[in-house]
């Protein structure tokens, strides 16, 4: 597959990234650009997906709050989190099935985490990748997806070394009582370079 992988250094403002992503998606739809997987980090921000409830925003002045076009509810992005924007043309794969695509994303992230001896699972009910921790589950990767003419955009956010206290201003993904975790919180000190390498390796096992 002729897919471009882009890794941005430093922190990329959320709205700047979304505008660039939408522009790229338009070109993929038109057939003038290759598909892309974009790996980046954002400065601290809360994003409100298309089904966000205002009651899930607990502290409205902690970080900027931005409405976004992805599916889902409130989420947090910030330093130490690997954001993965996936721009794939599902028509080219004869896979015009959004549920199957989301499941494939789940398999990809679960397999990537397994590279670092993390046992996780994808939930189709509470969309995302979770880790069972003692008596409850904690989310380690959040999903938010949108399609334009069967080209995917937005994607996945995986907590590597994220400051988990930054989630205190929201009900993450609208799921009361659920926790969040990170590779660091699970005792895994992993660099972005190491994680990105595993992501790329496992990607081609799922998205042939």
Swiss-Prot record:
GO terms for biological process: protein modification process. Residues 31-208 form the BPL/LPL catalytic domain. It comes from the Bacteria. One of its GO terms (cellular component) is cytoplasm. It is found in: Cytoplasm. InterPro entries: aa-tRNA-synth_II/BPL/LPL (IPR045864), BPL_LPL_catalytic (IPR004143), Octanoyltransferase (IPR000544). It is an enzyme of class 2 (transferase). Its EC number is 2.3.1.181. In the reaction, the free carboxyl group of octanoic acid is attached via an amide linkage to the epsilon-amino group of a specific lysine residue of lipoyl domains of lipoate-dependent enzymes. Belongs to the LipB family. This is Octanoyltransferase. It comes from Anaplasma phagocytophilum (strain HZ).
């Amino acid at each position: 597959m002729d897919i471009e992988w882009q890794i941005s250094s430093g922190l990329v403002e959320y709205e700047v990234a979304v505008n660039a992503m939408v522009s790229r998606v338009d070109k993929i739809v038109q057939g003038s650009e290759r598909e892309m997987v974009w790996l980046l980090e954002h400065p601290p921000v809360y994003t409100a997906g298309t089904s966000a409830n205002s009651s899930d925003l607990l502290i409205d002045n902690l970080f900027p709050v931005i409405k976004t076009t992805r599916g889902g509810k409130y989420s947090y992005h910030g330093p130490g989190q690997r954001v993965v924007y996936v721009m794939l043309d599902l028509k080219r794969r004869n896979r015009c099935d959004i549920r199957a695509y989301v499941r494939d994303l789940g398999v990809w992230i679960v397999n990537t985490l397994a590279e670092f001896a993390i046992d996780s699972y994808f939930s189709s009910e509470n969309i995302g990748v979770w880790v069972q921790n003692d008596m409850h589950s904690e989310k380690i990767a959040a999903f938010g997806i949108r399609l334009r003419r069967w080209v995917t955009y937005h994607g996945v956010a995986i907590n590597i070394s994220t400051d988990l206290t930054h989630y205190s201003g929201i009900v993450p993904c609208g799921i009361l009582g659920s926790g969040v975790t990170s590779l660091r919180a699970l005792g895994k000190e992993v660099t972005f370079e190491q994680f990105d390498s595993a992501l790329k390796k496992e990607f081609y096992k799922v998205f042939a």
